[in-house]
């Protein structure tokens, strides 16, 4: 899997771009290496989102995180048939118990 960050505002991110790419790649690799997960039957994108959000929370719980995975399935794509499917899964995470106030 190739991971790229395009047109994002990674300069505002709690993680540097390179570290974020590494975090996502490590999460994906751990899914592939897990023998108990059947990648052909389970929703890999949801599992990946969960892993990425867990790692981001470990990095810092001061932020709100939104993770989105878009999957393009081209199994039915050939010269005679232009069928494909596109799926997008989204997950979010934040620490609801932490409230930040500015006292003036």
From Swiss-Prot:
Keywords from the UniProt entry: Cell projection, Cytoplasm
Main localization of the protein described in the UniProt heading: cytoplasm
Cellular component terms per the entry's GO annotation: cell projection; cytoplasm
Cystine connections: none
Cellular compartment(s): Cytoplasm; Cell projection
UniProt similarity note: Belongs to the TDA2 family.
Protein name as annotated: Topoisomerase I damage affected protein 2
Gene name linked to the record: TDA2
């Amino acid at each position: 899997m190739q991971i790229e960050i395009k047109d994002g505002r990674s300069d505002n991110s709690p993680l540097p771009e390179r570290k974020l790419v590494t975090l996502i790649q490590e999460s994906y690799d751990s899914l592939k290496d897990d023998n108990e997960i059947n990648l052909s039957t389970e929703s890999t994108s949801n599992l990946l989102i969960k892993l990425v959000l867990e790692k981001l929370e470990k990095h810092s719980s001061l932020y709100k995180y939104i993770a989105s995975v878009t999957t393009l399935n081209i199994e039915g794509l050939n010269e005679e048939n232009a069928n494909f499917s596109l799926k997008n899964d989204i997950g979010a995470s934040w620490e609801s118990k932490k409230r930040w106030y500015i006292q003036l």
